[in-house]
Regions:
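Short, solvent-exposed polar/charged micro-motifs at secondary-structure junctions
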Residues: 21-25, 80-81, 104-105, 156-160, ...
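Acidic, Ser/Thr-rich peripheral helices and adjacent loops at domain boundaries
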Residues: 25-34, 86-98, 183-193
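Structural alpha-beta junctions
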Residues: 4-13, 62-68, 87-93, 166-177
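An N-terminal, globular interaction/scaffold subdomain
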Residues: 1-71
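A broad structural signal for short, well-ordered beta-strand segments within beta-sheet-rich domains
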Residues: 38-41, 64-65, 88-91, 143-144, ...
Length: 194
């Protein structure tokens, strides 16, 4: 609610109802005031044939001249910009971590990337990138010749971090499964930020 006071907005939540129902049905709820902060929250539950036409149902609720952001908190389409709700948005937010196969989700996002697409896995490595960059200011002042990124197999943020390091250093980057850590190899020492 505090954020909504600084950035008032309208939030439209689209949730699937019974897709297999014979009759189209729209259950809607509007929240204003205390329940929504300075926001208006519209909750739409689409059932039956209507479930396949979410963008048509959402369009009348959009505010004119207001940026639209579509966020899939769970499983997102392979190409978010091609999804009917994604086509309405200037920014599309996904989270590969919640996908059935997180690494495959990241790979499919790369193939279908369109300007305006963001995956929260990239945001999760912001502090790691800052920490690793600041580690370069410490002795020994030598180039990085290798790197190791270790952690959960199912965490795509670590795969993205390994890819980011591979694009930045002149050396091999290894992705391992194990304890969470990053090692930066240099000719005379290995740096492990903590």
């Amino acid at each position: 609610n505090a954020a909504s006071r600084e950035h008032p907005c309208r939030v439209i939540v689209v949730t699937p109802g019974d897709r297999l129902a014979d009759k189209a049905r729209l259950d809607a709820q509007i929240r204003v005031g205390r329940d929504a902060g300075a926001n208006e929250v519209v909750v739409l539950r689409l059932s039956g044939p209507l479930a396949g036409h979410a963008s048509s149902v959402v369009t009348p609720f959009l505010l004119p001249d207001t940026p639209v952001v579509t966020w899939w908190p769970d499983v997102a389409p392979k190409v978010p910009a091609d999804d009917p709700l994604g086509r309405l948005a200037i920014r599309r937010i996904t989270d590969a971590t919640n996908g059935l196969d997180p690494l495959e989700c990241i790979k499919s996002r790369l193939k279908g990337y369109t300007s305006g697409d963001t995956d929260l896995a990239w945001s999760r490595i912001t502090y790691w990138r800052a920490l690793l960059t600041s580690a370069l200011d410490e002795a020994p002042h030598e180039p990085i010749t290798s790197a190791l990124v270790s952690g959960l197999k199912t965490e795509p943020a670590l795969d993205i971090l390994a890819g980011w390091l591979a694009s930045r250093i002149d050396g091999q980057v290894q992705r391992a499964v194990g304890d969470l850590k990053v090692e930066l190899g240099r000719p005379r020492a290995t740096t492990t930020p903590s």
